[in-house]
Amino acid sequence: MNFTESMNVVHARIQQLEPENAAKIFGYLLLMQENGNRDMIRLAFCPDSVMCSVINCVKYELARNSHHYHSPPSDHIPTPKFGSFTGSSPLSVSVSPPMKTGFWENSTEMDTLQNNLQFLNFEDPLTSPEFSNGFFSQERQCLPLRTSRRSPSLPEFPVKICHYFNKGFCKHGNNCRYFHGQIIPERESFAQMFNPNNNLSDEEHVVSPVSLEKLEGEIIELLKLRRGAPISIASLPMMYYEKYGRTLQAEGYLTESQRHGKAGYSLTKLLARLKNTIRLVDRPHGQHSVILAEDASKFVEYTGERNEHGAILAGSRQIYLTFPAESSFTEHDVSIYFTSYGHVEDVRIPCQQKRMYGFVTFASSETVKHILAKGNPHFICNARVLVKPYREKSRSSRYLDNYKPLHGMRYGSKFIERDIEMNTLPPRVSESSRMRKPFLSEPEQSVSKSLPTNYSYLGFSSDDFKLTSNAEQEEQAERLSYLLDYLNTEDNVMNITTNYRDNDRRTHCESLDSQVLNLPESPFSSLSGKEISTVT
């Protein structure tokens, strides 16, 4: 909200509460406040009860200075008396005891007025017995009838309510920049609200040394429990709360989530002041971590160049080489070239037709730093070579390496040729085969169980269909399902020959050239085509 919007909101609220003198009251506020921008914004968001109290104070000040407003009768509550209404001087307000005694017409009105007087720093007469027994009515409070019955916690202009406070807990507490539903801040007064010298949100605000020392000791204790492991600044407040049962708090600091739109010490700046025992470590993507100073040397540094392949290892003795594929130098040539920088322990270049990278390991990490500091390019046997720092292998690549599909499964040569022919089937057949689940249905399982252990199909023995390695049952079931789909096509017929000799049933398949259906020998074959005579 800018200054113009805040002025419009304040003027509208004054016009609603005091329509007769709205222009004079609003003009007085503009003239007498030194820091008008901030004061107007605070007035725009203050409760109605506070706005009514401010209006009454301004009315009395205008009446006293210009004599255009007359003092209220003696049976009314005397209006608070104070000096000039400026932001730099705190309010000095006193209320004299009333002359008449009476009763409170409504306890809610009493609480509302007491809150208003406390907010304006009214002094001892508020707590005196004479003041508490005074006679007040809605008309004698100088407040409109509609405002006295209105909840003071409902501001006229909507404010941003804290989402986490509504859910039950906000770790920022009273320092949260959003509205927590409180009527009046506990540590604020009317003088603090309109004081231009208020430095709570100033960047130069000094953090208390006692608070800083206490916070440092608590963070050190928290880091020692981690045994040298760093803690990210994003998770530090929550870990601090779980450990000590309170929010991470130091006078004058704001967390990183609170910095947007509001000045103040960020948590990063606050921890940077603890240089003797705590170190801040840069992390990828702009994050920061905090670690004990004694453990900082053991931590992997992320200050160098970063990419998706991983982080640069601190103290690494390897370098990464890239070069054109047409280069012809050998590992021995690379070793001779880099020996001029330091002792070379190992050179690795993959044995590929188009090799384009390699690794060199040195005896000392200082040699690596010297080579990287020299820069690129390097020339080995007239080939341009680029040197890059060795990076740690990322977790994602390790995960993929552990879950690579099984390779090296060899099948019989004849079956491989037949498998190629199967892949040339019509789309209707091939799609139905590939879309089948790896598990067989019950009819297919019954057929597969009825097949003998040794059988021949299309001139191939059953050994050609066996895997040379121990394949999983799912692979076997999928192969058998694929085979059954192929056999059930209209262009292929499976010929089964059944023989009842020795009560054994055997299946014989003819080759693709012979499409003749051979019926098995039957003991009733002699009766075929003849009449069967019955013997009586």
Swiss-Prot record:
- Organism (species): Arabidopsis thaliana (Mouse-ear cress)
Its EC number is 3.1.-.-
Under the heading SMART domains, the entry gives: RRM (SM00360)
Residue ranges of domain RRM in the record: 317-392
A Pfam family of the record is PABC_AtC3H46
Gene3D superfamilies with a match to the protein in the record: 3.30.70.330, Zinc finger, CCCH-type (4.10.1000.10)
Q: Where is the HTH OST-type domain?
A: 211-294
PANTHER family listed in its UniProt record: RNA-BINDING (RRM/RBD/RNP MOTIFS), ZINC FINGER CCCH DOMAIN-CONTAINING PROTEIN 18
Taxonomic superkingdom: Eukaryota
Record InterPro entries: AtC3H46-like_PABC-like, AtC3H46-like_RRM, Nucleotide-bd_a/b_plait_sf, OST-HTH/LOTUS_dom, RBD_domain_sf, RRM_dom, Znf_CCCH, Znf_CCCH_sf
The beginning of the lineage is:
Eukaryota, Viridiplantae, Streptophyta, Embryophyta, Tracheophyta
Q: What is this protein called?
A: Zinc finger CCCH domain-containing protein 18
**Keyword Cell division, does the record have it?**
no
Q: Name one GO molecular function term.
A: DNA binding
